[in-house]
Curated annotation (Swiss-Prot):
Belongs to the UPF0173 family. It comes from Listeria innocua serovar 6a (strain ATCC BAA-680 / CLIP 11262). InterPro entries: Metallo-B-lactamas, RibonucZ/Hydroxyglut_hydro, UPF0173, UPF0173_UPF0282_UlaG_hydrolase. GO terms for molecular function: hydrolase activity. Keywords: Hydrolase. This is UPF0173 metal-dependent hydrolase lin1612. Gene3D superfamilies: Ribonuclease Z/Hydroxyacylglutathione hydrolase-like. SUPFAM superfamilies: Metallo-hydrolase/oxidoreductase (SSF56281). Pfam families: Lactamase_B_2.
């Protein structure tokens, strides 16, 4: 399995013949190396409804026929407002089997809304995501602050990789993310959600250096991937 990072919180997972895009904020994202019109994933997974995470989901899903996995409130919105048909609605605490493996949604402390035609629309609770693929557990925290139940996430799902936001202001910053890494006890921690906008400028290498002894961290450059 290969996991690659594409700026902000966009990651791509390739397992066998299946491609999964997570939070595909591509258009308007100067930090992203992808082109929306070239993406043909089998699945798109969304952590919440903010525009910098839903991103190009509708265009990509309509072009590719990808199944969109997200919380049920966001799923309803995408179906009714944007005409998406291949949607797998879920909610926090639930898990579901797909051809590629299992998806489980966890809590995240953040918001989830959009503005459409002058209306502010709530799109359900934000989530984190635990993927179980090829016997490996990958935790994608989404946008969140630090919370103590991250310990429970790590206990219930021994983690091989954890993607954690470090940008501060809208999510936890590097200091809290280092505590999150301690709580989760993942084998590898990868920072995300930083340097896309001035308000979330951070040094990811400094974050990795701040991790507790025994916790491995890695900064993925834009477009770079790892094999696990």
């Amino acid at each position: 399995m290969k996991i690659s990072f594409h700026g902000q919180s966009c990651i791509k997972i390739i397992t066998g013949n299946t491609t999964i895009l997570v939070d595909p904020f591509i258009s308007g994202n100067e930090k992203c190396d992808l082109k929306a019109e070239e993406q043909m994933p089998d699945f798109i997974v969304l952590s919440h409804g903010h525009d910098d995470h839903v991103g190009d989901t509708v265009e990509i899903a309509k072009n590719s026929g990808a199944t969109v996995i997200c919380n049920a409130d966001l799923a309803s919105f995408l179906a009714v407002e944007d005409g998406l048909e291949n949607i797998a609605p879920m909610h926090i605490g639930g898990k579901r089997q797909f051809d590629f493996g299992q998806v489980k949604l966890t809590q995240a402390f953040h918001g989830s809304q959009t503005v459409r035609d002058g209306r502010i629309i709530n799109l359900g609770f934000p989530t984190g995501i635990v993927f179980t693929i090829e016997g490996k557990n990958i935790y994608f925290a989404g946008d969140t602050g630090l919370f103590s139940d991250m310990k429970l996430i790590g206990e219930l799902n021994p983690l091989d990789v954890a993607f954690l936001p470090i940008g501060d202001n809208f999510t936890m910053g590097p200091e809290d993310a280092a505590i999150a890494a301690r709580f989760l006890q993942a084998k590898l921690v990868i920072p995300m959600h930083y340097n896309t906008f001035p308000l979330i400028e951070q040094d990811p290498h400094q974050f990795v250096a701040s991790l507790d002894e025994g916790i491995s961290g890695k900064v993925l450059e834009i477009g770079e991937g790892i094999e696990i």
